[in-house]
């Protein structure tokens, strides 16, 4: 039997006008969830492998509960999720059409994972019996505290013998807390067995 795969990162509420309508045209938004690491967890479960998603969500929050239900629907184990102070991050998407590019507006400041501190997540417990750990460069970009959590996660995963994959997923506009990706990511990458990148990440 395959050992579980754990992915770690932020999940956000995705709000988008239907079809190709623009923000200023539409009286409604379609609500779904979005996050690169959660997408990987769902994909892993789709291949029939045991999959777990780790994040920090606000407590006593119906949106958090709805997301956990969505994970279960796709066969992802949400049992590692930690509840902490803060809010649920949101992003708005306007789908592009023809020559008009898509537009994304983020509203994630003060999200639960951005406010989580080193020690709020017991990574040793989360990684017990796990075979593979996946993270992206989005998590350390969110905040200094999230960057510390990301480094804690890969360091402990490596110490416990897990295979580690890191998708750089460089988002220039996210790195606003004082350090750049070039300053932060090498410390994470030295623990990785697999690095996923493209020409825009360099």
Where are these regions (language model features)?
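Conserved beta-alpha-beta core of the PfkB/ribokinase-like small-molecule kinase fold
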Residues: 132, 138-202
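Alpha-helix N-cap/helix-start capping motif
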Residues: 38, 86, 199-200
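Glycine-rich phosphate/adenosyl-contacting loop at the front of the ribokinase-like
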Residues: 1-76, 116-118
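Short glycine-rich anion-binding loops that position phosphate/pyrophosphate groups of nucleotides
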Residues: 10-12, 97, 109-111, 138-140, ...
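Short, glycine/charged-enriched secondary-structure capping and boundary segments
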Residues: 20-23, 67-69, 120-121, 147-150, ...
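Conserved N-terminal subdomain of the carbohydrate kinase-like
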Residues: 50-137
């Amino acid at each position: 039997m395959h050992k579980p795969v754990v992915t770690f990162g932020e999940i956000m509420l995705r709000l988008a006008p239907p079809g190709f309508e623009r923000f200023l045209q539409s009286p409604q938004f379609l609500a779904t969830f979005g996050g690169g690491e959660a997408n990987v967890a769902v994909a892993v479960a789709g291949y029939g492998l045991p999959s777990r998603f780790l994040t920090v969500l606000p407590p006593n929050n119906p949106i958090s509960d709805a997301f956990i239900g969505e994970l279960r629907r796709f066969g992802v184990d949400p049992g590692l999720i930690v509840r902490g102070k803060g809010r649920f991050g949101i992003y708005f998407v306007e789908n592009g059409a023809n020559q008009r590019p898509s537009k994304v507006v983020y509203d994630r400041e003060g999200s639960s994972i951005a406010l989580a501190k080193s020690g709020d997540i017991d990574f040793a417990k989360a990684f017990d019996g796990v075979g593979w750990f996946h993270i992206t460069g989005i998590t350390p970009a969110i905040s200094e505290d999230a960057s510390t959590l990301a480094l804690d996660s890969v360091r402990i995963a490596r110490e416990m013998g897990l295979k580690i994959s890191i998708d750089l997923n460089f988002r220039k506009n996210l790195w606003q807390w004082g350090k750049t990706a070039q300053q932060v990511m090498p410390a994470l990458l030295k623990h990785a067995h697999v690095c996923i990148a493209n020409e825009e990440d360099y």
